[in-house]
Amino acid sequence: MRPTAARTENSVVIDAPFDLLWDITNDVANWPDLFSEYAAAEILEQHGDTVRFRLTLHPEPDGKVWSWVSERVMDRENRTVRAHRVETGPFAFMHIHWTYVQTDTGVEMRWAQEFHMKPGAPLDDAGMTERIDRNSKVQMALIKERVEAAARAVAGVAR
């Protein structure tokens, strides 16, 4: 039986065509240029719409570097992505679900993350929930800015 999960859910509406948003946000190798928190993203395996990769964060002030392997399954037709950590580190488990929904003002990108921290982890479920929730908002705002700039650049070229 799996422990009760902590959960965060955040969304942002991005004024860009779905195809552009999908392509940019699912180009894992380019995540260090999309997200501010990643120092490196290494593709380990890719089979069709499934990618296994290693993410490495920028070093913490004390020099500690966090890195882990995740697997991501992209379903463009249904506009969803499911991911989980393969190397769980301080997490007992981490499951992530991304959805993309067309709205009148753009595409709503939603991230739902369910997880549970291991005993002895640097943060408990409540602390990690607060950290993930705060950081998701920062990263989504950055992605919105970068994807909307790319959409404007593409629209400018198309004229």
Task: Show which residues each predicted segment covers.
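Hydrophobic-ligand binding "helix-grip"
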Residues: 3, 32-33, 43-49, 58-108, ...
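Short acidic, glycine/proline-rich loop/turn micro-motifs
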Residues: 120-126
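Amphipathic alpha-helical segments that line or abut small-molecule/effector binding pockets
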Residues: 19-22, 137, 141
